[in-house]
């Protein structure tokens, strides 16, 4: 029987049921792991390494070859938990995606997610077959598994170097879109029997993507409409409802034989750009769930690895990773982005920024569950590849961005985090915001905000003291503002507040607008 065998006594040939004492021990271990993982984020942020490596290391240390000595080999459980975690991670990523930023990058990102994946799979699989001796089915699985990129890993090392919107938008949209076709390819290659003809496979991929996209957009729009028109009795219910709607999108897409991963990403993106009530609270809740999902998933994947078995697979992993990084990824980027006249500097950065993260290691469990011959070797190769090339690419990304002179827009003012609470019976909204340290709203008088008729600043909280402001009250950094707006002018009031936060009191004349909602 697979699973974690931690010296648990058995009764009548079966594992004994979980007791309260076992639960207490489990909660203690899980909470300690979470605390260690949270503390490790500080180390990873200073070193420039994506945090996924730290979490994987924690899992390996807890495993049978580490200090924990836990034997865990349940690939099916890992796959199920990994899928659930990936749904949460994609939902959090979609909620934080600004439509205005990725809209110009959609054609290029779509090309990378479809044509780019095909090129990457073909080149990498060919190299894996001829250079490492893998059978064609195994080589195709490896090529498909490692073709998925992880923008979260990229942004974790580039967060201190703001990039042009096109680069960030392309990387973010690509990572959200390419998971779906890659999952379909891995499942198809891992299925028993001959692989479908390429045109049949392409047709199935396009059909599943279309179903997933349609359901995701529909569920997201309906969910956003409902949350904007129904006043829930407690603010804490809004984040729960948003995440539940995102999971509904995934489940509906998967059960309809579409791409559930694309559905959850698009549904979350629709809701993330709909100016929902209590948005900062929702983003904070989703961000916390995303961290928990990442920590749990990577620790579990680390547990599944058996380090003493990796020795024979290190060289093949390095060879495949070298071809992927130096040939397949750059070729995909050049073929897909050159028609869109993307400058070579941006192409170079996006070629190097194809970091692999959670998805490849999760997808490597699919052939293990399917009983594909050599599946354990596939998992080991993918694991080594992800770890080694993340160690190489992660710390060098900021250096490359500076060398290519792409670290610009660093002095842009921070957006305001505006939280909106509906006042259903009064047919209005209460907007709450805090002026960030670098906001250009600092030094602006209340009357210089020029809010639309029907909106007014009713209260200012400064250093723990609240007062009703006068028209001549000067706003300062750290002030919390409460703004009451009627339903018809709520959106206009939010846009004006964001515009002043970005451009100061002359925002309207200088062309600064507030159309993009806060993340």
What annotation goes with each model-predicted range?
Residues 442-488, 493:
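Cytosolic Rossmann-like ligand/nucleotide-binding regulatory domains
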